Curated annotation (Swiss-Prot):
The keyword Phosphoprotein applies. Zn(2+) binds at residues 665, 667, 673, 744. Residues 289-310 have a biased composition (Low complexity). GO terms for biological process: cell population proliferation; cellular response to mechanical stimulus; cellular response to parathyroid hormone stimulus; cellular response to tumor necrosis factor; chromatin remodeling; epigenetic regulation of gene expression; negative regulation of cell population proliferation; negative regulation of DNA-templated transcription. It is found in: Nucleus; Cytoplasm. This is Histone deacetylase 4. Residues 66-169 form a coiled coil. The active site is at 796.
């Protein structure tokens, strides 16, 4: 819009005007119309020109006017554009409203059409329904007329015609009934007794209308739902109804025949037999075990549920399925109608520790179950004695329904075991809880005797010929173990009687030298007291001349009553005439005391062997019936004094408790849960088999208190996972919603960490208490070191989050309690589990008094739990006291012995020596041992390597080191590694590492990982700077470098020291090459 200006002030469109001479200026007016003089393309009125003489003064105002004019033009254009824009918007709105009205009209029209179509369809359906009703009514009328016609024909029939003709259905039913009867009769004739198939005699008692005490159908396992011989419904007892023309005599004969058949069944008692025979060979009655009606009630007594088991025999069996578990499962199922996907732990790498494990199909599960049943009997054969009165938890059932729902089998098998018991047999140990016998045996198939596999054909003595044998492995285990235990007891009773007879001969012939008594570790205290009275009376008859009745009997006591000094004083105070008899009696008492002490020691060994097999035995908690002190004869029985607690040996301590075995998923399938009870049971059996357990001191564990748990975990977390279900109901409902239904059918907090409503809280607290007890005994000097065989693990458990099989962090709680109660200033925690201990790191991340060092697979955060990066060094005052030896590089190649030994040599041990701890705690997970699948580890360490790592750590803190079991799921691997660690703790000579490992250099990924860790922590620990050049060396090369360095230092020291100080030193202390004085 702007025009180019000339120097004279005119625009480019204007032509220059010729100046007039001064003579003509005087004759011109002041203003002139120059319209005619302008060019044609310039409008005269558009640009008026001022031709006054004083134009030179108005020329500077021309650009300002032009600018103002341009501004006005711009404003006009803007207003025009604004008006056009408003017009467009109004047009758009008008068209939009028009289109909206059209669309709405079309929508209404469509809805109207749809409604009309629905109305027509509904009307057609109504008409069709009416036609169907009419047709059905017509058919009913026709059928009614047909029946009336038949009835009329029957009324008007002739006398010679038959009154009724059997239909085709009746004939088929009759034929099937006759065939079943013939098959059952032929089967009985072939076997001469009832079939051994449980389905037969369950079905045989189910249909009976005469036997009202048959077990309810709900108690039968799902495996019994197949059609069986001789089984038919109650309505089919008499397939042909009696007609008016049939005589009653025929019906009575049928009833008598049925009663005779039922009397021949071995499941019912025969009342016509003699009483002695019935007591001696009493067949198994279902009503005694599967029903809880009164013992003397008749057939009309109502049955109770199958879960209520009669305690008539003095035993209350353990019911596997508890109401608490049922209620939790019911809450999980009924919450929001269905179970949503699991709200699992979310991490940057892996959400769950078992992600990627192959799923086990039903066929594999069935095969594993058969192998488990095959391997269970050899495991039970090895020195496992089952006491009468105990109840086996059915871990060997063929299906979860048979284990949980089949409550009729458990009392049935228990009653069967009681029937095998002789009348004089009494329960030796009472109060034993459920015994979980794991299916996987530590003993391989090559160690199993061939005769053990024949136990399924074993028929116990005393059983009637018609009584069927149980068909599952659990009942066979009951019977076999029962008989073995009874044979042991009979054998040792005879030996005990011979031993007591020998003692009596010693009393009657004091001049004969005493012989060493035989040892029988299987005897119990009850047997000692049982034979005590029998031995006292003959001894009173043999020594009638003694004056003091208190010395008349030799008592075999549980513990000594008097010390030897007191006995010597009593001898000195006796009269001279009684001194020989008193000395003789003292000799006898000493012999009996020695014998009893030896027997108590053997009883403890027997108790340990039973605990190793998974059977808790406590002799001290049971006291047999004894004579009251107020009775006249009580003076001859001295009072027994409880044994004072003995001080443990200063050696390696072990802690283990069978209650931790009960923490199992309610689905019962251990194949889908790597963290199962067989882990610690196999380790404990391995320690027993190798003899390492006998060299250690076994301590008693306990449950950790809630206050101890809250040293690391929050109060809500402690109450939720550490209390019973009743206390859990008092918590906020949002807290209890963390439990979810697992795909296997059980309950858990995620797909890995299962939850058992009854046993998980107790097992988790017991694991913490066992670790705490062992750590405190080692820290106070009662024990040298220790190994805790505990589960569930704990190093993944955070302050308020359970994960990775862990609920409570046992090692972290023990460290906190050491700080609070014993004022331990420096604690070293080494975690060599293949997974990072995120919970332990969180508990001490800002604590400079606890040095946490973890060796784990990291893979840049792509391995569970995703934490444990090398740059996580701590915070606040704890900076530098959190060392993560994070291996990166995946499994190409996997880490092995050379890499872990190099990490210990260059990172772990130098920092630990510089830290100088007072106590060393080890989160001892063995899932880095070879044999674990990739999701659970994938590394190839050997079990021997962990023995050498343990031996290196024993050089710290004066040897005060405690290992607590964490991860590890391959049974062979964890058993070998545990054996190696316990051997190292005991100070045994370890097997040498292979030469290949000694000369093998760590792989490139491991070297890179160690260099990264050393670079980060070199500013906190000065010892790392000296060892950085030897990271890539093998063990042999590193030892050579250290020897050369030591020789160089020695040579430099000898050159810098003068002769006189050397001579003076030789006089004061020996040199290195001299032998120490």
């Amino acid at each position: 819009m702007s025009s180019q200006s000339h120097p004279d002030g005119l625009s480019g469109r204007d032509q220059p005007v010729e100046l007039l001479n001064p003579a003509r200026v005087n004759h011109m007016p002041s203003t002139v119309d120059v319209a005619t003089a302008l060019p044609l393309q310039v409008a005269p009125a558009a640009v008026p020109m001022d031709l006054r003489l004083d134009h030179q003064f108005s020329l500077p105002l021309e650009p300002a006017l032009r600018e103002q004019q341009l501004q006005q033009e711009l404003l006009a254009l803007k207003q025009k554009q604004q008006i056009q824009r408003q017009i467009l918007i109004a047009e758009f709105q008008r068209q939009h409203e028009q289109l909206s009205r059209q669309h709405e009209a079309q929508l209404h029209e469509h809805i109207k059409q749809q409604q009309e179509m629905l109305a027509m369809k509904h009307q057609q359906e109504l008409l069709e329904h009416q036609r169907k009703l009419e047709r059905h009514r017509q058919e009913q009328e026709l059928e009614k007329q047909h029946r009336e016609q038949k009835l009329q024909q029957l009324k008007n029939k002739e006398k010679g015609k038959e009154s009724a003709v059997a239909s085709t259905e009746v004939k088929m039913k009759l034929q099937e009934f006759v065939l079943n009867k013939k098959k059952a009769l032929a089967h009985r004739n072939l076997n001469h007794c009832m079939s051994s198939d449980p389905r037969y005699w369950y079905g045989k008692t189910q249909h009976s209308s005469l036997d009202q005490s048959s077990p309810p159908q709900s108690g039968v396992s799902a495996s019994y739902n197949h059609p069986v011989l001789g089984m038919y419904d109650a309505k089919d007892d008499f397939p042909l109804r009696k007609t008016a023309s049939e005589p009653n005599l025929k019906l009575r004969s049928r009833l008598k025949q049925k009663v005779a058949e039922r009397r021949s069944s071995p499941l019912l008692r025969r009342k016509d037999g003699p009483v002695a025979t019935a007591l001696k060979k009493r067949p198994l009655d279902v009503t005694d075990s599967a029903c809880s009606s009164a013992p003397g009630s008749g057939p009309s007594s109502p049955n109770s549920s199958s879960g209520n088991v009669s305690t008539e025999n003095g035993i209350a069996p353990t019911v596997p399925s508890t109401p608490a578990e049922t209620s939790l499962a019911h809450r999980l199922v009924t919450r929001e109608g269905s179970v949503a996907p699991l709200p699992l732990y979310t991490s940057p790498s892996l959400p769950n520790i078992t992600l990627g494990l192959p799923a086990t199909g039903p066929a594999a599960g069935a095969a594993g179950q058969q192998d488990a049943e095959r391997l269970a009997l050899p495991a039970l054969q090895q020195r496992i004695s089952l006491f009468p009165g105990t109840h086996l938890t059915p871990y060997l059932s063929t299906s979860p329904l048979e284990r949980d729902g089949g409550a009729a089998h458990n009392p049935l098998l228990q009653h069967m075991v009681l029937l095998e018991q002789p009348p004089t047999q009494t329960p030796l140990v009472t109060g034993l809880g459920a015994l979980p016998l794991h299916t996987q045996s530590l003993v391989g198939a090559d160690r199993v005797s061939p005769s053990i596999h024949k136990l399924r054909q074993h028929r116990p003595l005393g059983r009637t010929q018609s009584a069927p044998l149980p068909q599952n492995a659990q009942a066979l285990q009951h019977l076999v173990i029962q008989q073995q235990h009874q044979q042991f007891l009979e054998k040792h009773k005879q030996q005990f009687q011979q031993q007591q007879l020998h003692l009596s001969k010693m009393i009657s012939k004091p001049s004969e030298p005493p012989r060493q008594p035989e040892s029988h570790p299987e005897e119990t205290e009850e047997e000692l007291r049982e034979h005590q009275a029998l031995l006292d009376e003959p001894y009173l008859d043999r020594l009638p001349g003694q004056k003091e009745p208190s010395l008349a009997g030799v008592q075999v006591k549980q513990e000594p009553i008097e010390s030897e000094e007191e006995e010597v004083e009593a001898t000195r105070e006796a009269e001279p005439s009684q001194r020989p008899a008193t000395e003789q009696e003292l000799l006898f008492r000493q012999q009996a005391l020695l014998l009893e002490q030896q027997r108590i020691h053997q009883l403890r060994n027997y108790q340990a062997s039973m605990e190793a097999a998974g059977i808790p035995v406590s002799f001290g908690s049971h006291r047999p019936l004894s004579r009251a002190q107020s009775s006249p004869a009580s003076a001859t029985f001295p009072m027994s004094v409880q044994e004072p607690p003995t001080k443990p040996r200063f050696t390696t301590g072990l802690v283990y408790d069978t209650l931790m075995l009960k923490h199992q998923c309610t689905c019962g399938n251990t194949n889908s849960h790597p963290e199962h009870a067989g882990r610690i049971q196999s380790i404990w059996s391995r320690l027993q088999e190798t003899g390492l357990r006998g060299k250690c001191e076994c301590i008693r564990g306990r449950k950790a208190t809630l206050e101890e748990l809250q040293t690391v975990h929050s109060e809500a977390h402690t109450l939720l996972y550490g209390t019973n279900p009743l206390n859990r109901q008092k918590l906020d409902s949002s807290l209890t919603s963390v439990f979810v239904r697992l795909p296997c059918g059980g309950v858990g907090v995620d797909s890995d960490t299962i939850w058992n409503e009854v046993h998980s809280s107790g097992a988790a607290r017991l694991a913490v208490g066992c670790v705490v007890e062992l750590v405190f005994k080692v820290a106070t000097g009662e024990l040298k070191n220790g190994f805790a065989v505990v589960r569930p693990p704990g190093h993944h458990a955070e302050e308020s989050t359970p994960m990775g099989f862990c609920y409570f962090n046992s090692v972290a709680i023990a460290a906190k309690l050491l700080q609070q109660r014993l004022n331990v200033s420096k604690i070293l925690i080494v975690d060599w589990d293949v997974h990072h201990g995120n919970g332990t790191q969180q508990a001490f991340y800002n604590d400079p008094n606890v040095l946490y060092m973890s060796l784990h697979r990291y893979d840049d955060g792509n391995f569970f739990p995703g934490s444990g990066a090398p740059d996580e060094v701590g915070t606040g005052p704890g900076v530098g006291f959190n060392v993560n030896m994070a291996f990166t590089g995946g499994l190409d190649p996997p880490m092995g012995d050379a890499e872990y030994l190099a990490a210990f040599r260059t990172v772990v041990m130098p920092i630990a020596n510089e830290f100088a701890p007072d106590v060393v705690l080890v989160s001892s997970g063995f899932d880095a041992v070879e044999g674990h699948p990739t999701p659970l580890g994938g590394y190839n360490l050997s079990a021997k390597c962990f023995g050498y790592l343990t031996k290196q750590l024993m050089g710290l803190a004066g040897g005060r080191i405690v290992l607590a079991l964490e991860g590890g799921h391959d049974l062979t691997a964890i058993c070998d590694a545990s054996e190696a660690c316990v051997s190292a703790l005991l100070g045994n000579e370890l097997e040498p590492l292979p030469e290949k490992v000694l000369h093998q250099r760590p792989n490139a990924n491991a070297v890179h990982s160690m260099e990264k860790v050393m670079g980060i922590h070199s500013e906190y620990w000065r010892c790392l700077q000296r060892l950085s050049p030897t990271v890539g060396h093998s063990l042999i090369e590193a030892q050579k470098c250290e020897n050369e360095e030591a020789e160089t230092v020695t040579a430099m020291a000898s050159l810098s020291v003068g002769v006189k100080p050397a001579e003076k030193r030789s006089e004061e202390e020996p040199m290195e090459e001299e032998p120490p004085l």
